[in-house]
Design a protein with these regions (language model features):
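Positively charged n-region of N-terminal signal peptides that target proteins for export
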Residues: 1-4
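C-terminal motif of bacterial Sec signal peptides marking the signal peptidase cleavage site
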Residues: 12-14
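Acidic, metal/ion-coordinating pockets
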Residues: 57-421
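N-terminal, intrinsically disordered, polar/charged segments of Gram-positive cell-envelope systems
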Residues: 18-74, 93, 100-101
Length: 421
């Protein structure tokens, strides 16, 4: 209650007058609306009265005001950072060091703008002491970690068929460098200590976006026939049905939304294969929400999959292709390897407080390769002109490559889902 004192002196020849004023005052503040009560005013000759007004004891929400929009968070992922020898050479500096920043110079702004940015780090980062190398046994300099972080990536997926290319030393060097230099970065798929592996009882990685808890898992089909160290059976997260099911179920207990990043499929195939379909079913049955696939080195379709028993829906990106590469292959189909995709998925909460996908799509990316220092980089297709396409040295390996070729490939594989803005 509040009080308003009004001093009124009315000389009305001894006559008293009483006046009642009823007024409905509505005050709006965001979604809150309050209505004042009746205001009573009394006046008497040569007298002073206190006028009292009452407000409602409780402020009630308006039934006709829309609720505030739930926050949205954008997740992006790009495909394989595949450092063939000419890619490494383009990043070699005059003093013998390596600087990989040029690979990300045309895409880092959008990568950094995402709320959560993931990348498939195809090759192990074992450091220069083990020898920098391209295909078939890859190894990158530690400075690649610096460039990945500088580009804005938050999650590094290392479970690939090349994780053991430099043996135990390469994997341990890579894991230690990430942990020592960038503890804020989530590194998935490889382990130099058992404590970080779900196969040894660790919980899945959980990332918080506002009030959302996002679990992210990363697996590979294999390691090119290279055995894991006998004393480190946990070194690489492999696609094992029992382990994957347990991991996803645990993730569902701990998180609001589960992402799985599998390294799977058939190289250079533009459609999913039987193995991918098998694993998709397993992921859906156990409650995964989003699949972001890599390994084929070309783009593959995007589709919703529904588990028949639970009717749970899951969005699948079968393959994001290469983020950057300079394959040594020649002939028909090589041009396909120069097209990759940035998955774009927006999450929000529905009226029940459940995290769901509010929007999704994909932005095509082009590996642009030319000889010389900093001659290799990646562009979004929307920024890639026909003139740039003509300068791309990949035309010497596959003459069919052109901007139009890339557009037609995206249309063929992704239909209307690919975005240019």
């Amino acid at each position: 209650m509040f009080y308003i004192c009004i001093w009124n002196i009315f000389l009305l020849f001894g006559c008293a007058k009483t006046e009642m004023l009823s007024e409905d005052n509505t005050v709006t503040n965001g979604n809150i609306v309050s209505t004042t009560g009746t205001i009573a005013i009394e006046t008497e000759a040569i007298e002073t009265e206190v006028i009292e007004t009452e407000t409602q004891d409780a402020i009630q929400p308006s039934s006709d005001q829309p609720p505030e929009d739930a926050p949205e968070y954008k997740i992006i992922m790009v495909g394989d950072v595949l450092l063939h020898t000419p890619v490494e050479e383009s990043c070699l500096q005059l003093d013998g060091s390596y600087d990989y920043d040029s690979l990300f110079s045309h895409t880092k702004e959008e990568i950094a703008a995402a709320d959560l940015a993931l990348v498939n780090q195809e090759v192990i980062i074992g450091g220069a002491d083990l020898g920098i190398s391209g295909y078939p046994c890859f190894n990158a300099d530690y400075s690649l970690c610096d460039s990945l972080v500088g580009a804005g990536f938050d999650v590094i997926c290392h479970a690939t068929n090349h994780a053991m290319d430099k043996g135990r030393a390469g994997l341990v060097n890579c894991a230690e460098y990430w942990r020592d230099e960038y503890p804020q970065i989530t590194v998935l798929g490889i382990h130099d200590i058992a404590d970080t592996s779900t196969s040894c009882g660790a919980d899945p990685a959980i990332i918080e976006l506002g009030d959302m808890r996002i679990a992210v898992l990363n697996y590979t089909y294999g390691t090119n026939g290279i055995s894991l160290p006998a004393d480190m059976p946990y070194a690489v997260d492999l696609l094992n049905e029992e382990q994957v099911a347990a991991d996803i179920q645990r993730a569902e207990e701990l998180a609001d939304f589960t992402i799985v990043c599998p390294h799977w499929g058939t190289e250079y195939r533009l459609t999913s294969d039987a193995s991918q379909e098998k694993w998709t079913k397993i992921f859906a049955e156990n409650g995964a929400d989003l699949i972001l696939g890599t390994h084929p080195h070309v783009i593959e379709p995007i589709e919703w999959v529904t588990d028949e028993a639970s009717e749970h829906e899951m969005l699948v990106y079968y393959s994001l292709g290469n983020f950057v590469n300079w394959t040594s292959g020649t002939g028909e189909g090589v041009a396909n390897r120069m097209v990759g995709g940035m998955a774009e998925v927006t999450l929000t909460k529905n009226d029940n407080g459940e995290v769901e996908i509010a929007d999704y799509g994909v932005k095509p990316m082009i590996s642009h390769v030319t000889s010389g220092p900093e001659g290799v980089t990646t562009y979004f297709l929307e920024n890639y002109s026909e003139e740039l396409a003509e300068e791309n040295d990949i035309v010497l390996q596959d003459s069919s490559f052109s901007r139009e070729y890339c557009v037609n490939l995206c249309d063929s594989v992704w239909g209307d889902l690919w975005k240019t803005e």
